[in-house]
Design a protein with these regions (language model features):
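Conserved N-terminal beta1-alpha1 strand-loop-helix module at the mouth
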Residues: 1-93, 100-128, 144, 150, ...
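Active-site beta->alpha loop and helix N-cap motifs at the rims of alpha/beta catalytic domains
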Residues: 82, 133-135
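Paired acidic/hydrophobic, glycine-rich loop segments that form the ligand-binding mouth/hinge
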Residues: 86, 185-186
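Short, local alpha-helical segments
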Residues: 135-137, 148
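Glycine/threonine-rich flexible loop motifs
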Residues: 139-141
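C-terminal binding/interaction regions
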Residues: 180, 184
Length: 208
């Protein structure tokens, strides 16, 4: 079971659907200029072809910046773009199948929402788990109520692999999830809505 440490306390998520009309590549450049070293590319509203082309561009820029690139949901696009890994939800391709396809050099993360899911993912050889939602979130409907930092602390005690906390996390509350044991905090809306994305990333990283 992998114990590979995550390279950054910030797990930035780039979602073109929240870009406020700005080109996704421009936002990516701003994220990297701000110091992002761990990035997930999520593009649920794009066609497969559009997502693939964006992933190829993102791979080149993230490689130059020394930033890990994780593709949301799509093992095929992660492999085709030579991304560093994939993040899977509970209803996506089974972890063991993704591992067989992607091998052990690429990261595989799993979304979890309770203790059993977290333990199952850790036992099934995930490289890290996403856990949440920690706080209320408007980004996407999870079907789960906010878990809070107390539950996050319980998860931290129960699993040894890295934890990425997600759900309603902002610059204002990010230290709460770090203090509760998260190795990294996934932030979407607070970054995507920022007028100055690079400066937002710098401020968040400065808190750690």
């Amino acid at each position: 079971m992998s114990r590979r440490a995550l390279p950054s306390p910030l797990y930035a998520i780039l979602d073109p659907g929240q870009s406020k009309g700005r080109p996704a590549i421009r936002i990516l450049a701003d994220l990297l200029n701000g110091g992002a070293k761990l990035l997930q590319l999520r593009a649920k509203e794009m066609t497969s072809n559009e997502f693939y082309r964006l992933a190829i561009e993102a791979r080149e820029l993230t490689r130059q910046a020394g930033c890990l690139l994780i593709i949301n949901d799509r093992v095929d696009i992660a492999m085709a773009s030579q991304a560093d890994g994939v993040h899977l939800g509970q209803e996506d391709l089974p972890l063991e199948t993704a591992r067989r396809l992607m091998g052990r050099t690429r990261l595989i993360g799993i979304s979890t929402h309770d203790l059993r899911q977290a333990q199952d993912a850790a036992g099934a050889d995930a490289d890290y788990i996403g856990f949440g939602p920690i706080f209320g979130t408007s980004t996407k409907e999870t079907g789960y109520s906010p878990r809070g930092t107390a539950t996050l602390k319980e998860i931290r005690k129960a699993v040894k692999i890295p934890i990425v906390a997600i759900g309603g996390i902002t610059e204002d509350n990010v230290t709460q999830v770090w203090d509760a044991g998260a190795d990294a905090a996934a932030i979407i809306s607070d970054i995507m809505k920022a007028e100055d994305v690079a400066e937002k990333v710098r401020r968040i990283l400065a808190l750690r």
